[in-house]
């Protein structure tokens, strides 16, 4: 388990290099035994690719593997991404939720934005980001 956590922390540190100034990285495993190391690495790689393309300005990136969606967002950060990978079926679909404050509104107020993506396994075992919704 320690090797798995160390490996994922290394992957997350590398993936954050394209994510601007990163002030904190944390990984929480509450039910990681449900997934193999390969599955967790595949999800991390898919998330890395997705966030590198879509979220260049993040300052805090937290990735969690757990069963309970965590919607905590710290108001003192301009951008905070807290990503929860939640099993929606046995092993083939995970929900990735991103919650952040966006102060780019025309009236200069902070809006709490939640974007949801469904990550699905492909026939070759890789993960990709599927459907998307925003609230």
What are the residue ranges of the model-derived segments?
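Flexible low-complexity loop/turn motifs enriched in small/helix-breaking residues
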Residues: 17-111
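Short, solvent-exposed secondary-structure capping/transition elements
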Residues: 4, 105-109, 126-130
């Amino acid at each position: 388990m320690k090797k798995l956590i160390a490996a994922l922390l290394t992957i997350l540190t590398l993936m954050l290099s394209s994510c601007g100034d990163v002030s904190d990285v944390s990984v929480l495993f509450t039910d990681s035994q449900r997934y193999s190391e390969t599955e967790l690495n595949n999800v991390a790689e898919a998330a890395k690719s997705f966030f590198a393309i879509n979220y260049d300005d993040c300052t805090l990136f937290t990735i969690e593997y757990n069963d309970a969606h965590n919607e905590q967002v710290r108001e003192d950060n301009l951008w905070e991404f807290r990503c929860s990978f939640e099993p929606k079926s046995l092993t083939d679909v995970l929900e990735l939720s991103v919650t952040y404050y966006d102060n780019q509104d025309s009236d200069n107020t902070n809006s709490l934005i939640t974007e949801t993506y469904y990550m699905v396994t492909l026939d070759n075992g890789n993960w990709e980001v599927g459907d998307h919704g925003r609230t």
